A protein has these predicted regions:
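N-terminal Rossmann-fold NAD(P) dinucleotide-binding loop
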Residues: 15-16
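NAD(P)-dependent short-chain dehydrogenase/reductase
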Residues: 149-204, 209-214, 244-247
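Conserved Rossmann-fold NAD(P)-dependent oxidoreductase catalytic core, especially the SDR/UDP-sugar
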Residues: 96-137
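NAD(P)-cofactor binding segment of oxidoreductase domains
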Residues: 67-68, 81-111
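Conserved catalytic-site region of short-chain dehydrogenase/reductase
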Residues: 77, 112-126, 139, 145, ...
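Conserved N-terminal Rossmann-fold NAD(P)-binding element of oxidoreductases
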Residues: 6-10
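NAD(P)H-binding glycine-rich loop region in Rossmannoid oxidoreductase-like domains
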Residues: 52-90
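C-terminal substrate-binding subdomain of Rossmann-fold SDR/epimerase-dehydratase oxidoreductases
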Residues: 192, 197-303
Length: 303
């Protein structure tokens, strides 16, 4: 890792987790976020309040960092569902402004967080590998896929596209229509109903946040690594199975409110993770039941 350090664009759930991981390994880390100074940051992490659309600010930050990890995106699959203009304005447009600021720095190494849960749509077979066609069903997935296409104009040896699955764990904010595990745990703790969209047989790949940050840290430490990488656990869990796991962890029966399936929702997605296994000597270490237990304890301690 270069002494020039790592710039993380986006200080949300994943950006903060990555900053803590990399700083804990002794790397110099800066985080750019619109409200970076609102939350305390440990020593060794320089928090900068600002937006990626600020060309002058981005220019100054990029000049002092050799590696950039881009985690900022203004939509979720639910928030931009059926709203392509919102996806363009809140998701893709700010990213393109960042990419414009990056143009004078072709030597910068960029790791971009795409979306393994949405860009593939419903693939023909599972698990889905990185060379499968991109066929998103949602506006959010289309925005991420478009960003990936723009990145093909960058030097390929300095560009990594990361396609994470459904990441969960301590630190995840409660957002409507996003983060099923946190929502289920909150519903169980507060005796609130959980809205289940569709038949509950939707298959998802869930990755614990510490396993995610470990994978990204390993890639940043391998300067030869480039290209596209799926980041997941490599196994599928249905929503009904997830409900059962949360009920077993909490000892409470969830009250389910059945809702019609939503247009644009992926039905089945499990990621093939052989490429990241080989490139970074990485494998997920956290069982889903254990990750749910750790998340429940964190929620109880931070209620």
């Amino acid at each position: 890792m270069s002494e020039a350090g790592v710039l993380i664009v986006g200080g949300g759930f994943l950006g903060r987790a990555l900053a803590l991981k990399l700083a804990g390994e002794g790397r110099r880390v800066s985080v750019l976020s619109p409200r970076a100074e609102d939350a305390p940051w440990p020593a060794g992490i320089a928090a900068v309040s600002g937006r990626q659309e600020d060309r002058a600010l981005m220019g100054r930050l990029l000049a002092g960092h050799e590696t950039v990890i881009h985690t900022a995106w203004g939509t979720t699959p639910g928030s931009s569902a059926g709203r392509p203009e919102l996806e363009g304005e809140a998701g893709l447009r700010p990213f393109l402004a960042f990419l414009e600021a990056l143009q004078p720095h072709p030597g910068a190494r960029l790791l971009f967080l795409s979306s393994g849960g949405t860009v593939y749509g419903d693939p023909a077979s599972l698990p889905v590998a990185e060379d499968a066609p991109l066929q998103p069903r949602s506006c959010h997935g289309a925005g991420k896929a478009a960003a990936e296409l723009f990145l093909r104009a960058r030097p390929p040896e300095r560009t990594l596209v990361l396609r994470p699955s459904n990441i969960y764990g301590p630190g995840q904010a409660l957002k409507s229509g996003f983060g099923a595990i946190r929502h289920l745990l909150v519903c169980a703790a507060e005796a609130r109903p959980f809205q289940l969209w569709g038949d509950g047989l939707q298959l998802r790949d869930y990755l614990y946040v510490d396993d995610f940050t470990d994978a990204v840290a390993r890639l940043t430490a391998r300067p030869q690594a480039h290209g596209v990488f799926n980041l997941g656990c490599g196994a599928g869990t249905s929503l009904r199975e997830l409900v059962a796991l949360v009920e077993a962890e909490t000892g409470r029966t969830l009250r389910i409110e059945a809702q019609p399936a939503r247009a644009g929702d992926v039905v089945r997605i499990v990621l093939d993770i052989e490429r990241i296994r080989r490139a970074a000597d990485w494998a997920p270490a956290t069982r889903l039941a254990d990750g749910i237990a750790r998340t429940r304890r964190w929620l109880a301690e931070n209620a």
